[in-house]
Amino acid sequence: PAAEYVTNAFSTDIKDEFKDDAEPRHVSVAGRIMSRRVMGKASFIELQDSKGRIQVYITRDDICPDEDKEMYNTVFKRLLDLGDFIGIEGFVFRTQMGEISIHAQKLTVLAKSIKPLPIVKYKDGVAYDSFDDPELRYRQRYVDLIVNDGVKETFQKRATIIRTMRAALDEAGYTEVETPILQSIPGGASARPFTTHPVSYTHLRAH
């Protein structure tokens, strides 16, 4: 099995805890490449972890301090794609544009994305390549959760609400009982649906 990659910070925590007058904080983060700008010997990428996104500044000589520059020239510039998982070790700083970022000192490739993601691109405030087709979003929910941040937030809020309600009712002595639900469209995985008719609505078929 692959070795575990140990992290010690999340993107949102790094931004919230950053102080300009403090000593540079060394962090280890991991996430998915959501965008990148390659400019010769230096590049910027946007890394997304389970909490949010943060910018990473990568230079060839920092991640390749020896004479061998293959990690930057070949792996990073040519082989890595949007959607790939990488690990970054470095220190936190603020760029000249005022954005809190990580200055990478070590890059580790963690996992390759088999298929390219429909990453949303912005230019002059206009979004391009948006993954907003309703049918595709429901059929490929895993992609929807990756590229559309609001969807993940909705699921997290829903899980929190259900967990809180269940805990409160359980503490009050209630018992949770699962009951079957009738619907007009048959469904299910391995279960065989049956047909019934509501007494008051004989013209309706329920499954």
Which residue stretches match the model-derived regions?
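Class II aminoacyl-tRNA synthetase catalytic cores and aaRS-like
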Residues: P1-R205
